[in-house]
Amino acid sequence: MTIRFEEKVSTENAQFVCQWSNSLGKVFQEQWIGPRIPFLLTLQALEGVFSIFDEQEFVGLIQKIRLEDSNLHIGRFFINPQKQEQGLGGQALRKFVSLAFENEDIDSISLNVFEANQRAQNLYQKEGFEIVQMVEAPVRKYSRLKLE
């Protein structure tokens, strides 16, 4: 397994992401990208992301959402459902975090995950993220996790 990243997502790969997300349904999509982006996912909603490749195969994406006060907030991390449970998610997250910390302006990395998404929460905690806040949102509860 050789994970690498490319800034942006090609139209062809964005179509794969839309297919993957749409095939998992509205509930999954709201957990993954939030309720502001309507189901069915379209290409226009995928700006500002990095493509994740295993060798030459496109396997997922991750987004740098914002940098505030030396904290990089990331999100919309998604691995092809057919490639999950193979260690790609952990390896991709470790490498992305490692590359982010090479930037001297970044001291911490945060992300949000819905409480019901235990699989994602377990992955983030396994990779060293810690829950720093529980947020009661109008629709559902989520955790804010941070890695320093």
Label every PLM stretch briefly.
Residues 3-82, 99, 103, 134-137:
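Acetyl-CoA-dependent GNAT
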Residues 80-82, 86, 115-116:
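Active-site acidic-Proline motif in GNAT/NAT acetyltransferases
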Residues 83, 87-96:
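Conserved acetyl-CoA pyrophosphate-binding loop and the N-cap/start of the following alpha-helix
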Residues 90, 115-133:
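Conserved active-site alpha-helix within GNAT-family acetyltransferase domains
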Residues 95, 99, 122-123:
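Structural preference for long, well-ordered alpha-helical segments within the folded cores
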Residues 102-112:
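Conserved GNAT acetyl-CoA-binding A-motif
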Residues 111-121, 137-142:
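Conserved beta-strand-loop-alpha-helix junction that forms the acyl-donor binding cleft
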Residues 142-148:
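Terminal substrate-recognition subdomain of acyl/acetyltransferases
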